[in-house]
């Protein structure tokens, strides 16, 4: 394909990139949760600790507090210690999970910004699409920015329009 043919399909390229980025933005929470679950295998240890605590609580319910106070108190301290250990473990895992999700979100937005900047750079002086100038008469200079082509739609305006249209189309799925 020649450069002029590539420029002719620029509107579709930009629209597809904007659609893909918005779709990924909607799927980002699910994607980051999946990735963090894959990276963290501590949930098994937590469930094992919960099972141990549950077992000790059942054992505690069978012990008579009046007759076997020392055993009852020892078991209760053990349950409290294990519960505190579990809480600490869960807090650490939750903090790590938040860091992973934050990193994935930041990486996505940096990639999206780089993609949009590269599209603006490539199509800065070329109109993404050309329509009859009377269709956009009152706003033709604003819509054509930065190309200055009569009836042309500039990349910045096209990206804004695509973002709005795609956001409206994908709103029911978010």
Swiss-Prot record:
One annotated Gene Ontology cellular component of this protein: GET complex
Its GO biological process annotations read: establishment of localization in cell; otic vesicle development; post-translational protein targeting to endoplasmic reticulum membrane; protein insertion into ER membrane; protein stabilization; sensory perception of sound; startle response; synapse organization
What are the entry keywords? Coiled coil, Endoplasmic reticulum, Membrane, Transmembrane, Transmembrane helix
Q: Provide the coiled-coil residue spans.
A: 39-94
Chain ranges on the Lumenal side, renumbered to this chain: 1-8, 121-148
Instruction: Enumerate the subcellular locations listed in this protein's record, separating them with semicolons.
Output: Endoplasmic reticulum membrane
| One Pfam family hit | CHD5
Q: Where is this region: Interaction with GET3/TRC40?
A: 39-97
Bilayer topology reads: Multi-pass membrane protein
Residues spanning the membrane: 9-29, 100-120, 149-169
Q: Show which residues sit on the Cytoplasmic side of the membrane.
A: 30-99, 170-174
UniProt family annotation = Belongs to the WRB/GET1 family.
Per the entry, what this protein does is:
Required for the post-translational delivery of tail-anchored (TA) proteins to the endoplasmic reticulum. Together with CAMLG/GET2, acts as a membrane receptor for soluble GET3/TRC40, which recognizes and selectively binds the transmembrane domain of TA proteins in the cytosol. Required to ensure correct topology and ER insertion of CAMLG.
Q: Which PANTHER family match?
A: GUIDED ENTRY OF TAIL-ANCHORED PROTEINS FACTOR 1 (PTHR42650:SF1), TAIL-ANCHORED PROTEIN INSERTION RECEPTOR WRB (PTHR42650)
Its assembly, as annotated, is:
Component of the Golgi to ER traffic (GET) complex, which is composed of GET1, CAMLG/GET2 and GET3. Within the complex, GET1 and CAMLG form a heterotetramer which is stabilized by phosphatidylinositol binding and which binds to the GET3 homodimer. Interacts with CAMLG/GET2 (via C-terminus). GET3 shows a higher affinity for CAMLG than for GET1.
The protein here is known as Guided entry of tail-anchored proteins factor 1
Record organism: Mus musculus
Q: Which gene encodes it?
A: Get1
């Amino acid at each position: 394909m020649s450069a002029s043919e590539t420029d002719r399909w620029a509107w579709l390229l930009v629209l597809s990139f904007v659609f893909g980025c918005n779709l990924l933005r909607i799927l980002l929470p699910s994607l980051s949760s999946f990735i963090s679950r894959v990276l963290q295998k501590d949930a098994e240890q937590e469930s094992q600790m919960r099972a141990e605590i549950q077992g000790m609580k059942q054992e505690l319910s069978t012990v008579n507090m009046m007759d076997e106070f020392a055993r009852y108190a020892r078991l209760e301290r053990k349950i409290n210690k294990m519960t505190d250990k579990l809480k600490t473990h869960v807090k650490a895992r939750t903090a790590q999970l938040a860091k992973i999700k934050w990193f994935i979100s930041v990486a996505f937005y940096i990639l999206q910004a780089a993609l949009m900047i590269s599209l603006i750079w490539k199509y800065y002086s070329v109109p993404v699409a050309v329509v009859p100038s009377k269709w956009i008469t009152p706003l033709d200079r604003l819509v054509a920015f930065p190309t200055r082509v009569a009836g042309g739609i500039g990349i910045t305006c096209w990206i804004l329009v695509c973002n709005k249209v795609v956001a409206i189309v994908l709103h029911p799925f978010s």
